[in-house]
C-alpha cells in the first residue's frame, strides 16, 4: 500500500505538476495497528512523506531533447544556424552533400520546435527539409524551468 501511494504521488510532482521519474525511496520503519491500519492510511502516509521529502531532494524539471537533421541550400546555412542558436540548439555537424546543399545536424529542445516547419519554410523559400527524433531528456535550464513552473501555476489557478 505504501508503494502504491508513492507511485500515485509520483504522477503529480511538486514543481509544475509533471510526473516524477528516477525516484528512489526507502521505507525505514513502519508499524501495524489492527484498528488504525488500512490501505488508505498507508497510501496517505506515503503521499505525505513524498510531499515533505521531495522539496528537500532539490528536484529539477527535465526537457525532451531531439536530434534535428536539416537539409538546406548552401546559401541558407548561416540563417538556419542562427535560428538554431536562438532555439537553444547545439549544432553537432555540417555535411555538404556536394549538390549545393548542406545537412546540418543539431540537438534541440522539443519545446523550441513547435513552429519550426513554418519558420524553416520562410527562411529557405520552401527549399529546406528536416527530420526530428527524440533522443533523451536533459535538465531544463533555470530560466526555462521558471517559465514552465509559472505557466503550470497559472493553468492550475485558471481551473
Feature-to-residue mapping (PLM):
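Accessory interaction regions appended to the cores of large information-processing enzymes
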Residues: 1-159
Amino acid at each position: 500500500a505504501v508503494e502504491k501511494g508513492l507511485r500515485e504521488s509520483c504522477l503529480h510532482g511538486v514543481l509544475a505538476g509533471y510526473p516524477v521519474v528516477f525516484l528512489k525511496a526507502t521505507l525505514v520503519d513502519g508499524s501495524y495497528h489492527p484498528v488504525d491500519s488500512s490501505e488508505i492510511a498507508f497510501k496517505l502516509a506515503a503521499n505525505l512523506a513524498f510531499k515533505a521529502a521531495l522539496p528537500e531532494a532539490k528536484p529539477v524539471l527535465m526537457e525532451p531533447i531531439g536530434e534535428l537533421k536539416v537539409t538546406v541550400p548552401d546559401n541558407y546555412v548561416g540563417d538556419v544556424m542562427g535560428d538554431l542558436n536562438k532555439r537553444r540548439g547545439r549544432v553537432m555537424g555540417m555535411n555538404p552533400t556536394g549538390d549545393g546543399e548542406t545537412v546540418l545536424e543539431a540537438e534541440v529542445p522539443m519545446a523550441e520546435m513547435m513552429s519550426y516547419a513554418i519558420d524553416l519554410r520562410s527562411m529557405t523559400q520552401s527549399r529546406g527539409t528536416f527530420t526530428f527524433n527524440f533522443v533523451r531528456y536533459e535538465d531544463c535550464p533555470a530560466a526555462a524551468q521558471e517559465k514552465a513552473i509559472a505557466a503550470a501555476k497559472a493553468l492550475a489557478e485558471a481551473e
